[in-house]
């Protein structure tokens, strides 16, 4: 288990460092830039040039006490404030993070702005220029329902590390008050704060499991944790797999309609027979 603290500004980084020195601090911290400076300013309260200089100082201080710093890039596929952004600029921001010493990069769609084709295009660009897959983390919010599709698109481009939350919790930002997500700083640009969270880890892991991808996660235990999270929060969360569980792998007797075997026998059909006896074994249809 790696404990990560989100530390947007230097004061928070300093508190994390103090905690590490006292024996309780995080193993890893996160700072974030947005390619759209309006979005960045709304999130951090400062300019991009000033923030980059601050981040460089923080990386150096964190390294001195053994804390790794994750550099996050946001508004890669567009900004809810300024609109369209350029993928090429996000690749440049990624390089800048690594150049000043970030341990890894979170490529984030915090606002659900990424269509799957652009996700594949972006990560193909990134891996073409920075091929070490250990450096890249995909982070998709499900504001428009594209989360698992985007995970698949990123996987097809070559990404191997993904982030998710139980029940798809999170938002702008992912704050909790009395165990309930609350709105972030400033005007709230979503219509419903309950439908903006990070990709549901349950849905993502169930999908990967069905694709025979070994995640190393106990899928049934994960689904139980998701159910427990719903009880903790006190409402239905945004994981379809919590509700519907895994795809069945064996006959479910309780859902059978009675009488199939008797009807096949009455019609003179063999068990397992699926076509009339006078049909050829293979179809000759050629399109």
Predicted regions and their residues:
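Catalytic cores and adjacent flexible loops of soluble metabolic enzymes
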Residues: 1-287
């Amino acid at each position: 288990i790696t404990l990560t603290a989100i530390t947007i500004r230097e004061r928070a980084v300093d508190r994390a460092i103090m905690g590490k020195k006292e024996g309780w601090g995080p193993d890893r911290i996160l700072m974030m830039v947005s390619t759209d400076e309006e979005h960045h300013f709304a999130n951090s309260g400062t300019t991009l040039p000033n923030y980059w200089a601050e981040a460089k100082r923080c990386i150096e201080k964190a390294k001195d006490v053994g804390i790794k710093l994750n550099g996050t890039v946001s508004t890669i596929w567009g900004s809810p404030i300024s609109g369209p952004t350029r993928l090429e600029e996000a690749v440049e921001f990624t390089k800048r993070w690594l150049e000043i010493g970030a341990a890894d990069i979170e490529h984030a769609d915090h606002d659900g702005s990424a269509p799957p084709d652009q996700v594949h295009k972006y990560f193909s660009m990134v891996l073409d220029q920075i091929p070490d897959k250990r450096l890249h983390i995909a982070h998709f919010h499900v504001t428009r329902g594209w989360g698992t599709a985007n995970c698949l698109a990123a996987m097809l481009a070559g990404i191997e590390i993904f982030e998710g939350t139980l029940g798809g919790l999170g938002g702008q930002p992912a704050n909790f008050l009395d165990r309930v997500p609350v709105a972030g700083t400033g005007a709230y640009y979503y219509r419903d704060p309950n439908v903006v969270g990070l990709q549901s880890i349950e849905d993502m892991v169930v999908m990967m499991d069905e694709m025979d991808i070994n995640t190393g996660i106990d899928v049934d235990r994960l689904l139980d944790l998701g159910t427990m999270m719903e009880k903790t929060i006190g409402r239905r969360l945004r994981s379809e797999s919590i509700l519907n569980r895994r795809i069945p792998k064996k006959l479910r007797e309780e859902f059978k309609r009675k009488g199939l075997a008797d009807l096949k026998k009455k019609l003179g059909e063999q068990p397992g027979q699926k076509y009339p006896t006078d049909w050829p074994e293979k179809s000759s249809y050629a399109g």
